[in-house]
Amino acid sequence: MENRTYTADAEPGETVTVAGWVHEVRDLGGIAFLILRDTTGQIQVKFEKDEMDDELVETGLNVARESVITVSGDVEEEPRAPTGVEVTPETVEVLSEADTELPLDPTGKVDAELSTRLDNRTLDLRSEEGQAIFEIRAEVLRAVREAFRDANATEINTSKIVATGTEGGTELFPITYFGEEAFMNQSPQLFKQLVAGSNIERVFEIGPIFRAEEHNTPRHLNEATSIDFEGAFCDHTDAMDVCEQVVTAAYEAVAENCTDQLEALGITEEFEVPETPFPRLSYEEAIERINATGELDEQLVWGDDLPTEGEKALGDDVGGHYFITDWPAEIKPFYIMDHEDGELSTGFDMMHPRMELVSGGQREHRREELIAGFEQQGLEPEAFEYYTKMFKYGMPPHAGWGLGGERLLMTMLDLDNIREAVLFPRDRQRLSP
């Protein structure tokens, strides 16, 4: 829009044209106020009824909330106004009239159920809180990319349509691909390993993953954003170091560049950048500490995966981000390298006190051992021939991890439900919008 001024840039003494949504109208008799909202904030528009054209006043005061308008006029200093300035209008033009009955209140004065908010996402994102979450999300992804570049990693984009699942199993969305069965990719794991085996060496990807899991919890999605790293000539400890750097960089960027957004969410004082290095607990130590809390009905034994209540008990005990290392080889994927004893793997998880954020480890780069890993987990190596054949041509030791982008944001901002961190979430019940 030509000659438009954002509300945050309107200065006393200027003649401006501002455009946005009608946030609120207050009629006090001889004088009335309209609050106009745009992406940068709000500005007050003053109507002095006895001194203005009747048609101008009627247009400004009878327009429904959330209608889209432009206002042209002079900016004056007014300490009592929400932003210290106000506009005396010369013209008001209604660009799009809103219904008088709205499915939710973007001002936040009336609470709405999450399902109502997601069904009416455009309206929901007009709230300060909704806008703040996704501005912070954008800053997180910007900082993550910068941290990866600082770690000498190159951004890649891998296929999301595959012939076989990354980890086998049934948690795949099947599709028809020119008459053949194919699947939506559940992870870029195998692809990023193949690229790390080239001269590029260190790679990262930020992209969607699809998992046909029938979970219906506040922390699971069927389409999510995965932040992935893979590095040649890296072991599992190197990968954990990069993970710490990336996660900490995201927090630091938000703390420095998103103070207004954090204030809108009411978490300015509670927001803390994680201390490094993150504690590193072995799987065995994790089980011992969980059992010692007495929070579980039954004691965990070697080989058990950690239940949700166990993760929570351990998170409360540790009190910050931490790693769990040296998992039993039998409960980690086939591509994770084992330690020399064969009982423990190089796999690790990075945890927030509320939940798991990252899964990673050193990968098996020796072809014969990799094939054996397939067979031990009941997978057919022939189905992954495109992957295994590249290990015949010299595959360096390599390690990496995958981080759930929405989980990172959810835990960073203490959101109640992971769906709040997604524009248009996909779960078992939601396919639209």
From Swiss-Prot:
Disulfide bonds: none annotated. Mg(2+) 2 binds at residues 356, 359. The record marks 82 as: Important for tRNA non-discrimination. PROSITE patterns: AA_TRNA_LIGASE_II. CDD domains: AsxRS_core, ND_PkAspRS_like_N. One of its GO terms (cellular component) is aminoacyl-tRNA synthetase multienzyme complex. InterPro entries: Aa-tRNA-synt_II, aa-tRNA-synth_II, aa-tRNA-synth_II/BPL/LPL, Asp-tRNA_synthase_2, Asp/Asn-tRNA-synth_IIb, NA-bd_OB-fold, NA-bd_OB_tRNA. L-aspartate binds at residues 167, 211, 359, 363. Belongs to the class-II aminoacyl-tRNA synthetase family. Type 2 subfamily. Homodimer. This is Aspartate--tRNA(Asp/Asn) ligase. It comes from Natronomonas pharaonis (strain ATCC 35678 / DSM 2160 / CIP 103997 / JCM 8858 / NBRC 14720 / NCIMB 2260 / Gabara).
